[in-house]
Structures are given as structure tokens and as C-alpha cells.
Amino acid sequence: MSVKSTFRNGSAFPLALLFMLAAVLACSSGSAKKCTATLTLGGLTFVGEDAAEEKATRNACNKYCREADPGYEAMYGVWLDSPAGKAAGRPSKEEAIFKDKKLMDYVTVTCANECLAKIKDGKGKVETKCD
């Protein structure tokens, strides 16, 4: 059977579909790595997840910053009462970082770096497990 006749009788389409299905299954069959970091800081526990161990730890720090950092609490309170906070509909502490760049930078850069430094200094403890 020549290539020309294969395309004429329509059997090439199911064959191509079969190859595509095999490629999709091959690419998606491996389970993605998942790391979970459990941070204990100030007597409270925060969990962060990511495929990378370092990012899981940073995500746990970000969660600490949003939920328990006094600096973020103060910034959020001031912003919430500002015209920008009112215009944004007075969002939650978690949502506010997506509405204001300064809040986002404080959580993900300033506070997160301080949190990582506390871990390094032994003031905070993090346990990370990757599957």
C-alpha cells in the first residue's frame, strides 16, 4: 500500500490521531513533583506548596506575611481606609496584594526575605517534604 493510497482511503487520520493521543499520554503520565513546606514562626504554622522546595518555603513565608506579620497588618489597614482601598471594594488581606503593588512587594519581597532570614537565624523553623 503506497502513501498516496493510505491518504486516499482515510486511514491516515485515525493513525495520526492515535500518535497524538500517545504523545499526550506520554507527556502527562508522570506525576508532577510537589513540595510542601510547613513553617512555624511566632508559635503559628503556615503551609506553602510548589514543585520547587525553595518556592514552597517562600510560599509558606508569603502566607505568614499575609496572615500574621504586624507590618503587613499595619500597611493593609492604612491602605484599606485609603481611597484606593475603598475603590478596590475593601478586599481581604489575601486579595489586597493583587490590588496594590506596594502591598504585593511588601509581602513577596520585604516580608518574605525577613521571614527567610528568621529561618536562617533559627527564629523560625521550616520542614519541607517533596513527593
Residues of each region from the PLM?
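Bacterial N-terminal signal peptides
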Residues: 14-24
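Post-signal/leader-peptide non-cytosolic segments of secretory proteins
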Residues: 33-131
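Bacterial N-terminal signal peptides that target proteins for export
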Residues: 2-16
